[in-house]
Regions:
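Glycan-recognition and catalytic cores of secretory/periplasmic carbohydrate-active enzymes
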Residues: 1-312
Length: 312
């Protein structure tokens, strides 16, 4: 959005983290709940890329070193250890793992890319449920068919990590996973009225407002305010990160559905894509491509892996 106030808030939070830990010699791991508290690594590394402030990278490097005694994500992932077998298989670790992409972008070291790709694939294979939801009782267990709570926040974290994976690899199978999660889990975790979201959206069972399951989080006057109710809508918001993306050759349309997408090509020309369709209910998508001026560019269309007969 270009909201300067929002950016300033993030920078001030990052500066506070640096003053609290980097300037004092204290370690983030000493705060406990390390998979949660160390998740700031991906924000710090991204802020370093955006601002060039060396303190942010230094803080990220300290956290990376402390990973070795906690989640050990980089070494475990690069060593092809599946996520559910790693030391910290809770869902919050996925935000730590997003830091692997940021470190790869900063350093170019393949070990970070290798680790992220392996961890993502192991989750997709062993812990992504048939609904597109992730986790069983808030963590990876290596079996997606065991019934257990599939928490809203866990699925949103899986989708956020998948966006990073898609940006890294451009692999259309990742977009397939995002579509599966969006159209099943994210839609399913919301009441039709929009008033509440679930804590648990099961493969088979009953959907209940999150307030029934995690009432301990409630605040006076706001019984339905909790982590899941404020996080669930992000599943829809993430669509803006992966529906249309760029690669070295042009633009890639990953998501289908009625609507209009506007972007700017590398040439500086504006581009409008309009979809007329009732996808996924129907299989026909009419796409109107309208650049602001006549020009040649590459437009790639994702072919869903479930499609058996596709024509363009």
């Amino acid at each position: 959005t270009g909201d300067a106030a929002a950016r300033d808030a993030v920078l001030r939070a990052a500066d506070l983290i640096c003053r609290t830990f980097l300037d004092t010699g204290r370690r983030v791991r000493e705060a406990g709940s390390t998979e949660m508290n160390m998740a700031v690594i991906h924000i710090l590394a991204r802020l370093y890329r955006d601002t060039g402030r060396e303190r942010y990278l230094q803080m990220a490097r300290v956290i990376e070193k402390d990973w070795e005694a906690e989640g050990d994500y980089a070494r475990q992932g690069a060593g092809n250890v599946d996520f559910y077998r790693q030391p910290k298989p809770r869902w919050e670790s996925l935000h730590d793992i997003q830091g692997l992409l940021e470190l790869y972008r900063i350093t170019g070291e393949e070990k970070y890319k290798t680790a992220l790709v392996h961890i993502w694939r192991s989750i997709a294979r062993f812990d992504r449920h048939n609904t597109g939801g992730f986790s069983t009782f808030e963590q990876a267990i290596g079996n997606p068919y065991i019934p257990g709570a599939i928490e809203t926040c866990c699925t949103i974290a899986w989708m956020a990590m998948s966006v990073y994976m898609l940006k890294l690899t451009g692999d259309a199978r990742v977009a397939d996973e995002l579509e599966l999660s969006l159209l099943n889990s994210v839609v399913g975790m919301h009441a039709a009225s929009g008033r509440w979201a679930t804590y648990n959206t099961p493969m088979d069972g009953v959907r209940r407002a999150s307030a029934h399951d995690i009432v301990f989080q409630s605040r006076e006057g706001a019984p339905e305010l909790n982590c899941c109710s404020v996080n669930s809508a992000r599943g829809f918001g993430l669509l803006g990160d992966w529906a249309l993306m760029r690669d070295a050759e042009g633009v890639v349309l990953n998501a289908y559905g009625p609507g209009v997408i506007r972007t700017v090509l590398d040439t500086g020309a504006a581009l409008t894509l309009t979809q007329t369709t009732d996808y996924p209910r129907g299989g026909r998508v009419e796409l109107a491509v309208a650049p602001a001026r006549a020009l040649t560019f590459t437009l790639k269309l994702r072919i869903p892996r479930w499609s058996r007969h596709t024509r363009v």
